Design a protein with these regions (language model features):
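Conserved "HGTGT" condensation-loop signature of ketosynthase/thiolase-family condensing enzymes
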Residues: 1-241, 245-438
Length: 438
């Protein structure tokens, strides 16, 4: 058996999958330190969705979705095709669906390829890139992807979790020549990626996030990826409710040489059935929401009154939306009386459509963009399981980067930076062009 085959065999045995029901939530596990609750720094993130223009950076795409930025004033494409590019809608495919003929598995494979292949060239060409194996003279500058731990949330019942995890692992091994004896200068460790799959619905990403934080606590000298993907409208092609999200996280003391984009604490949930009803008590669902929000804020070292914005998944068009929205809105209004829920909240599926297993981390990614530029703490709320609401809190970095509305955004005109991750600004580089990060 050759080396690559050996790696593939051993890695296959390591793929694990946890199944949660379609609206499952995480079981929170926390080991608080004397200094406060455990939190991870967001080193970088990537988001793929057909609404994105390839020549604008990930950072801009998230802010565009939140209606916080516009295309550059000199954008010739907007000028020539305003009906297509001046409003948020699908503008291109991430994965080619062949008119709906592509299988769900094949569609998933294409998303993985688009995400991972984008890192290949810069990984081997730039010693300053966060993940790299560039310099042959000084391998101390390397940060290899060998052995990367990945927590990945996928839709229940639509994919084989073992096959999906194996495919992601093998794409990473092959793309970065991990353990490939034909390219001995491309790696120093042959450890395959460690992929853990969570199968579920809209809240599955919260489970993956909690598992990632558990891993970082146990492995403070490593980084971790948290991912989710779904395309709920398949076999329709190019729908804006398709989302692949990759969060790149590190522990609080990990030296990234970059400013964090944001900080994340553990998600928190509460079961409605655990609360009593009575004429002198609020409805049990409101009690559960109050407990979940308070715990999520505590897990992020915050008070509920620190929340300045809410991102949630209670689609206004869904038949069950009035209940979840009402319960969440009442809780936020009572816990954060200075926050206007109507004006200071974002209903993602009302804009993008129901997002399935892609919901939780897409909302977290939007929250990261908001806190990084606006500076207000964001509550990300999962409303789809009315028996067990869940929430997590996204905390701004120490230095907020205000949007500069009169300045242009970086554009990958030659697409050399298309679909690359958004990173925190390096400490040794001045923040020049909005949207440029390596």
């Amino acid at each position: 058996m050759n080396a690559c085959a050996t790696f593939a065999f051993s890695a296959t045995m390591a793929i694990t999958a946890r199944h949660v029901n379609a609206e499952a939530t995480t079981v929170v596990k926390r080991n608080p330190t004397p200094a406060g609750p455990y939190m991870a720094q967001v080193v970088g993130l990537q988001w793929l969705n057909p609404l994105q223009r390839r020549d604008y950076p990930t950072e801009w795409q998230l802010l565009w979705t939140l209606e916080l930025v516009k295309p550059n004033k000199d954008d010739d494409i907007v000028r020539t095709k305003p009906e297509k590019y001046s409003k948020l809608q699908a503008v291109g495919s991430i994965a080619v669906g062949n008119g709906g003929k592509e299988t769900f598995k094949g569609y998933h494979h294409k998303y993985i390829e688009e995400l991972i292949y984008a890192y290949h060239d810069i990984y081997f060409m730039d010693s300053n890139y966060f993940y790299n194996a560039h310099s042959r003279d000084d391998r101390l500058t390397w940060r290899e992807l060998a052995g990367i731990h990945i927590e990945y949330a996928l839709p229940e019942g639509k994919l084989d979790p073992v096959e999906a995890g194996n495919y992601l692992r093998d794409i990473i091994i092959n793309t970065f020549s991990i353990g490939n004896e034909s390219f001995p200068n491309a790696w120093t460790r042959s450890t395959p990626p460690d992929v853990r799959i969570t199968m579920g619905g809209a809240n599955a990403g919260f489970t993956s996030l909690s598992a990632a934080l558990d891993y970082l606590q146990a492995h403070p000298n490593e980084t971790v990826w948290v991912m989710n993907w779904d395309a709920p409208s398949r076999p329709k092609d190019r729908q804006i409710n398709e989302n692949m999200v990759q969060l790149i996280l590190a522990g609080p003391n990990y030296k990234t040489e970059r400013a964090p984009l944001a900080w994340l604490g553990y998600p928190a949930s509460a079961k409605v059935a655990d609360f009593d009803s009575g004429k002198d008590k609020p409805p049990r669902v409101n009690q559960a929401w109050k407990a979940a929000v308070e715990k999520a804020a505590h897990n992020a070292g915050k008070q509920t009154t620190d929340v300045g914005y809410v991102i949630h998944d209670a689609n206004n068009n869904a038949s069950t939306a009035p209940g979840p929205i009402a319960a969440l809105a009442r809780t936020v209004t009572e816990e954060v009386p200075e926050l206007d829920f109507v004006k200071q909240s974002f209903n993602t599926p009302a804009l993008l459509g129901e997002m399935g297993a892609g919901t939780a981390l897409t909302n977290v990614a939007l929250g990261i963009a908001y806190v990084n530029h606006i500076g207000k703490t964001v509550l990300v709320a999962g409303t789809t399981n009315q028996a067990q609401p869940i929430a997590t809190v996204v905390v701004p970095p120490a230095v907020v980067r205000p949007i500069r509305p009169d300045e242009p955004w970086f554009r990958a005109r030659g697409e050399n930076a298309a679909h690359l991750a958004w990173w925190g600004i390096r400490h040794d580089v001045k923040d020049k062009t909005q949207g440029y990060s390596r």
